[in-house]
């Protein structure tokens, strides 16, 4: 295989079909709701307030907005409480139970609006809508104001700080629900989230001040259709038929997930491509992601979010050893070593947990050891030496700050099993553990 062909394969986030060619598009049929979900007439009435198909071609579909979105119906709120802001715009509480997300750019607004409503339509048609409880509900939209309305939550998982033993059982239950949500997003919505991190997981208010409430996946601003859909091209049109937005669907490994939560299979692709090409060439080649790779990446990102929480449980002194380790990193995304270094905290902490919990059979192995043994990749001597040195440096930090509190995790079989399950698809090979089966 030529180098250019190999790089193209790495940039294409698709698993090979049994024949070796591209995977065919999978076609879904609308399923009637399960008993107890209402009659077909009720479903049709409910769908009146959602997107509808206005045009279909072999490769694309046009989705039309309902009339209600195009009218401003909400009025001025009685109060506004700022909850967050970013490049997209701002989020404000407008009541005790509701918040509004106001966008600066119409493109970002249309994108998230379409994705959120596709999820709501999937709930309407699902036989198991309870599997979507870990996905944020979309309440309403106002196109003139570029606003989306959502339920209000207490904080993000990134900001939650009460990590006592009493919150470990609800943590496990929360991540099991998030796993159901990601599978629902993948199989029933036909969507790839692509940006799962603790910042994008919200915490519902619990019965006590320090309790951990229900966890919900949010921020669909980068979610896109995968190739399991009959059409991947999606355009959004007004109720009058005017095209408002053409959804982006092409994805590449460099623009998938925040680096701290990038799965090992994605980091390998980034490492190989960055070593073979210059950055300008890399950024131009992107392709739609297949359903299997979408699942591998989103589920694995959930696993690394849970790993982050486990570190915070152990970090009793708030030393933040991982953040401090990476704050001294001198590499940039232009260098392949950067992506190797993004593996270090995953490898070191997973090795420690595998030993602590007596995990057998490589259940927490991602194909890389802190001794710089790579199961499916040949590195140069200097690269292996650097990786081994980085692992020793971080392990030294953990010895001082995390490991003395390992008793907090003893007996946490549910937490162990949840982490093993979430990381069961990831491996330092192009397609995750699937590569090992080929």
Curated annotation (Swiss-Prot):
Q: Which residues cross the membrane?
A: none
Annotated InterPro entries: Kinase-like_dom_sf (IPR011009), Prot_kinase_dom (IPR000719), Tyr_kinase_AS (IPR008266)
Question: Where do the Protein kinase domain residues begin and end?
Answer: 77-340
Q: Which GO terms describe its molecular function?
A: ATP binding; protein kinase activity
Which SUPFAM superfamilies does the annotation name? Protein kinase-like (PK-like)
Q: What is known of its domains?
A: The protein kinase domain is predicted to be catalytically inactive.
Protein family: Belongs to the protein kinase superfamily. Tyr protein kinase family.
Q: What is this protein called?
A: Probable inactive protein kinase 38
What is the native source organism of this protein?
Equine herpesvirus 2 (strain 86/87)
The organism's taxonomy opens as:
Viruses, Duplodnaviria, Heunggongvirae, Peploviricota, Herviviricetes
């Amino acid at each position: 295989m030529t180098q250019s062909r190999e790089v193209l394969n790495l940039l294409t986030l698709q698993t090979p079909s049994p024949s070796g060619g591209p995977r065919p598009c999978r076609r879904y049929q609308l399923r009637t709701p399960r008993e107890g979900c209402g009659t077909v007439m009720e479903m049709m009435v409910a769908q009146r307030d959602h997107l509808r198909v206005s045009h279909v071609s072999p490769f694309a579909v046009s989705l039309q907005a309902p009339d209600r979105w195009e009218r401003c119906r909400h009025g001025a709120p009685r109060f506004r409480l700022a909850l967050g802001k970013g490049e997209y715009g701002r989020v404000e509480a407008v009541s005790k139970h509701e918040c509004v997300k106001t966008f600066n750019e119409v493109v970002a607004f249309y994108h998230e609006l379409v994705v959120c409503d596709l999820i709501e339509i999937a709930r309407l048609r699902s036989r198991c809508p309870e599997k979507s409880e870990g996905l944020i509900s979309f309440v309403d939209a106002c196109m003139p104001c570029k606003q989306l309305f959502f339920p209000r939550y207490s904080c993000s998982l990134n900001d939650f700080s009460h990590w006592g033993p009493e919150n470990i059982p609800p943590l496990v239950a929360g991540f099991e629900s998030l796993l159901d949500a990601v599978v629902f997003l993948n199989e029933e919505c036909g969507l790839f989230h692509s940006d799962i991190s603790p910042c994008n997981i919200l915490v519902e208010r619990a019965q006590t001040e320090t309790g951990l409430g229900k966890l919900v996946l949010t921020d669909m601003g980068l979610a896109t259709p995968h190739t399991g859909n009959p059409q991947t091209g999606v355009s959004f049109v007004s109720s009058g038929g005017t095209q408002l937005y053409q959804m982006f669907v092409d994805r590449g490994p460099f623009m998938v997930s925040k680096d701290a939560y990038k799965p090992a299979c994605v980091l390998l692709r980034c490492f190989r491509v960055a070593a073979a090409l210059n950055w300008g060439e890399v950024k131009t080649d992107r392709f739609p992601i297949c359903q299997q790779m979408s699942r591998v990446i989103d589920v694995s990102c959930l696993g690394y979010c849970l790993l982050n929480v486990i570190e915070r449980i152990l970090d009793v002194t708030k030393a933040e050893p991982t953040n401090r380790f990476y704050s001294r990193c001198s590499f940039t995304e232009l260098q392949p070593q950067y992506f190797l270094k993004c593996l270090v905290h995953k490898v070191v902490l997973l090795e420690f947990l595998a030993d602590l919990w007596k995990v057998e059979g490589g259940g927490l192995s991602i194909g890389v050891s802190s001794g710089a043994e790579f199961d499916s990749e040949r590195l140069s001597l200097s690269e292996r030496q650097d990786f081994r040195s980085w692992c020793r440096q971080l392990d030294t930090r953990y010895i001082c700050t995390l490991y003395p509190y390992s008793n907090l995790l003893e007996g946490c079989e549910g937490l162990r099993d949840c982490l093993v399950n979430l990381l069961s698809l990831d491996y330092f090979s192009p397609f995750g553990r699937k590569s090992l089966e080929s």
